[in-house]
Amino acid sequence: MAGARRGWRLAPVRRGVCGPRARPLMRPLWLLFAVSFFGWTGALDGSGGTTRAMDEEIVSEKQAEESHRQDSANLLIFILLLTLTILTIWLFKHRRARFLHETGLAMIYGLLVGLVLRYGIHVPSDVNNVTLSCEVQSSPTTLLVNVSGKFYEYTLKGEISSHELNNVQDNEMLRKVTFDPEVFFNILLPPIIFYAGYSLKRRHFFRNLGSILAYAFLGTAISCFVIGSIMYGCVTLMKVTGQLAGDFYFTDCLLFGAIVSATDPVTVLAIFHELQVDVELYALLFGESVLNDAVAIVLSSSIVAYQPAGDNSHTFDVTAMFKSIGIFLGIFSGSFAMGAATGVVTALVTKFTKLREFQLLETGLFFLMSWSTFLLAEAWGFTGVVAVLFCGITQAHYTYNNLSTESQHRTKQLFELLNFLAENFIFSYMGLTLFTFQNHVFNPTFVVGAFIAIFLGRAANIYPLSLLLNLGRRSKIGSNFQHMMMFAGLRGAMAFALAIRDTATYARQMMFSTTLLIVFFTVWVFGGGTTAMLSCLHIRVGVDSDQEHLGVPDNERRTTKAESAWLFRMWYNFDHNYLKPLLTHSGPPLTTTLPACCGPIARCLTSPQAYENQEQLKDDDSDLILNDGDISLTYGDSTVNTESATASAPRRFMGNSSEDALDRELTFGDHELVIRGTRLVLPMDDSEPALNSLDDTRHSPA
């Protein structure tokens, strides 16, 4: 009974699970079930969101991988273009095409590749590309878009025409092969400009410095205003005839004049070097092109900075004009000072350290200091082109002498190679851009007016200035030289880089497209016709620059030398006695040139090698007198002889020592016998970079 009773008592408990007395126990169970159900449903939703996130991540990875492959293909295209250009140059070394140069052929290669990319290869645009319209008063540089609670950042690419809204994303590869303009200014231009200064032929450059400065400064300004005025007339005509679809002001015309006033006769100079054209003509063209690029870029910056007072920012204002002139002078002088200062700092570092014992570090420091000049000037609001140009000249004059022999060869070859690759890359890219740039604006009236303007602007530059310069020059600039300089006004890398730097507006797009056509025409027609023009103008070729004065009477040679050197005689003495000993290991010790009160400073700043040089020159505390015998100095493959005082040549040499010393330094660097009074100064380890030209475009300093 007990067991039965025990079982009965348990029975109601089992029945009570579903009975009325146990209903309060069901509520927690229902709650538990509900929580489990909704939790399971939420888990399903969460897994769906995770799946979508994973799908988006996979899509992003695929897009990144596809973009990487496409970028690699684009770079491969340019590498193949450069390879083809190098092979073409090698072929032209053996068989020259009379009316075609390598640079023109590089542009043709770029045109063919651009044509294939434009019409032969179609990369479908992303289906997610959407065109959104919104009313804003200005174009923001950065745009944040909220997509389902996620914010995405978009950057401004530039203005496009309304009829191209549906074609912007038509070909992804065309957008990929169009580089950011800053790539040209920060990567490609610095080695080209630096090499121009580093390989400058100083003797011929300084002998014609007055004429070069006149052509570069006055001539570029004249050309800019002539072209700007003519183009303003064309723009006015276009407005009257309804051909102008956007704003185009007089300041835009002046900016276009500054852009196309930048000459780059790289093709002509290469042919001049191969044919050994008259050195005076070569010096005038090369010097003008070197400084002309610097003047053109500073002039364009000054025009952009032109801001008259009042609401209309495009009216003429005298105050704003003088302000722009002040900006021009300030930017140019500041850039010049910054470039020279960087060269001086590099010279001091290489002099007072023992980096020459570690050639790799020495070359690396030289390279980085030289390149940083461009970026430093741009960061401070100056012009990097001017800064890096004068940095190259300063480095060649001072720093080069402090480098070890191996580093001297390395720096010469490094910048020669970079210059060669950068120039050919730009010419190939020019041809490519004609088809890959998607915002071209071609107007026949503007194009024809531009061609007429550049010819008239070049003529207004060369002929009037040559007439004025001949009034004060002993060696006149002949009419055949003037015609050749007029013909050699090619446009190239600098004009292209200035034009492509800003293509955000309708006016800038038209200027860029027209500049591209001008570059093509001048390189192909004028560059290809250089040889024929030399023959037509009867300009002598096969001239050895080192033998140019053979056959000239001695009295005329001395007179010409004195006239060409008197402006620089004071600078030469200051440089030889103070700057060279301070910045290099050469020259007389500062202890002998500075006043006695500066003795401690002079001893601190004088290189020990300078004392060694002085000890080699001393002979029992007496100056070395060149009277009792002959002395010969062998340097490389040449020998310099000094005969007895009764010989006529040494008498001439002694009689005009200051002018001769200056001319010889500008000619041979400082590996020479420099006679100052009766002391024989023999600078040691002091040379200028005599470059072995690889690309026939920039050449060794004399």
Curated annotation (Swiss-Prot):
Its main location: membrane. The keyword Ribosomal protein does not apply. It comes from the Eukaryota. Disruption phenotype: The SLC9A6 null mice show a 10-20% increased mortality after birth, yet the surviving mice do not display any obvious difference. Behavioral tests reveal a modest motor hyperactivity associated with coordination deficits and limited ataxia. Neurons from these deficient mice exhibit endosomal hyperacidification, as well as impoverished neuronal arborization and attendant circuit dysfunction. InterPro entries: Cation/H_exchanger_CPA1, Cation/H_exchanger_TM, NaH_exchanger, NHE-6/7/9. Endosomal Na(+), K(+)/H(+) antiporter. Mediates the electroneutral exchange of endosomal luminal H(+) for a cytosolic Na(+) or K(+). By facilitating proton efflux, SLC9A6 counteracts the acidity generated by vacuolar (V)-ATPase, thereby limiting luminal acidification. Responsible for alkalizing and maintaining the endosomal pH, and consequently in, e.g., endosome maturation and trafficking of recycling endosomal cargo. Plays a critical role during neurodevelopment by regulating synaptic development and plasticity. GO terms for biological process: axon extension; brain-derived neurotrophic factor receptor signaling pathway; dendrite extension; dendritic spine development; establishment of cell polarity; neuron projection morphogenesis; proton transmembrane transport; regulation of intracellular pH. Belongs to the monovalent cation:proton antiporter 1 (CPA1) transporter (TC 2.A.36) family. This is Sodium/hydrogen exchanger 6. Keywords: Cell membrane, Endosome, Ion transport, Membrane, Sodium, Sodium transport, Transmembrane, Transmembrane helix, Transport, Ubl conjugation. GO terms for molecular function: potassium:proton antiporter activity; sodium:proton antiporter activity. It is a multi-pass membrane protein. One of its GO terms (cellular component) is early endosome. Homodimer. Interacts with RACK1; regulates the distribution of SLC9A6 between endosomes and the plasma membrane.
